[in-house]
Amino acid sequence: MNKLIDFSKGLVPVILQHAQTDSVLMLGYMNEEAYQKTLKEKKVTFFSRSKQRLWTKGETSGHFQHVESIHLDCDQDAILIKVMPQGPTCHTGSLSCFNSEIESRFKIQALAQTIHQSAKSNQSNSYTQYLLKEGIEKISKKFGEEAFEVVIGAIKHNREEVINETADVMYHLFVLLHSLDIPFSEVEQVLAHRHQKRNNFKGERKKVQEW
């Protein structure tokens, strides 16, 4: 890919994107030397315009950006690198440098990221940490309880209750997945496969009494 990138025109903008959540993490710049170092070490290195030198992201904080894949845009003058961040990306301690929201829309992947960060935090009053410490049986029980609440709300035709309880179900599902070390991306892959697969009808299901 480096043969396709024309570094003779100056620094090339580089966008870092979380490999699992697709969150945009930061914007930096590379010269050819920084790019080659990134390829070799599999950790993102920029060319710092303020320091006027190569700068490996995380060299001071330890919050390295581990390369998962590298993509070049159609004009071959910008790079997208999907990474697994080792800690917060922003120097402020935030997960992303893009925190000044002009307009935002919640994405389900953000829930997984929030749970992941809560699990690593030292907050003694964290409900997420409490569930993870209690273990998979406790988490599974809570997930089942919340799912049953959705059923009750649906039977009562209580729209608001169904919405609220569904949110609780999603939260406990993501805690369960985290506890089992299952990234949501693997669930998405199964859904994508089923969506693309034709003639996926499996026939009539047996009634519960016949199972």
Swiss-Prot record:
Enzyme class, spelled out: hydrolase
User: Which named protein is this?
Assistant: Histidine biosynthesis bifunctional protein HisIE
The protein's Enzyme Commission number: 3.5.4.19, 3.6.1.31
Q: Which family does it belong to?
A: In the N-terminal section; belongs to the PRA-CH family. In the C-terminal section; belongs to the PRA-PH family.
Chief localisation class = cytoplasm
Q: What does the entry list under GO cellular component?
A: cytoplasm
Tell me, what is one Gene Ontology molecular-function annotation carried by this entry?
A: phosphoribosyl-ATP diphosphatase activity
**Listed NCBIfam families:** histidine_hisI, PRK00051.1, PRK02759.1
Alphabetized, the UniProt keywords read: Amino-acid biosynthesis, ATP-binding, Cytoplasm, Histidine biosynthesis, Hydrolase, Multifunctional enzyme, Nucleotide-binding
Pathway listed for it?
A: Amino-acid biosynthesis; L-histidine biosynthesis; L-histidine from 5-phospho-alpha-D-ribose 1-diphosphate: step 2/9; Amino-acid biosynthesis; L-histidine biosynthesis; L-histidine from 5-phospho-alpha-D-ribose 1-diphosphate: step 3/9
Signal peptide start and end residues: none
Which species is listed as the source? Staphylococcus epidermidis (strain ATCC 12228 / FDA PCI 1200)
Q: Name one GO biological process term.
A: L-histidine biosynthetic process
What is the reaction catalyzed? Answer: 1-(5-phospho-beta-D-ribosyl)-ATP + H2O = 1-(5-phospho-beta-D-ribosyl)-5'-AMP + diphosphate + H(+); 1-(5-phospho-beta-D-ribosyl)-5'-AMP + H2O = 1-(5-phospho-beta-D-ribosyl)-5-[(5-phospho-beta-D-ribosylamino)methylideneamino]imidazole-4-carboxamide
What CDD domains does the entry give?
Answer: NTP-PPase_HisIE_like
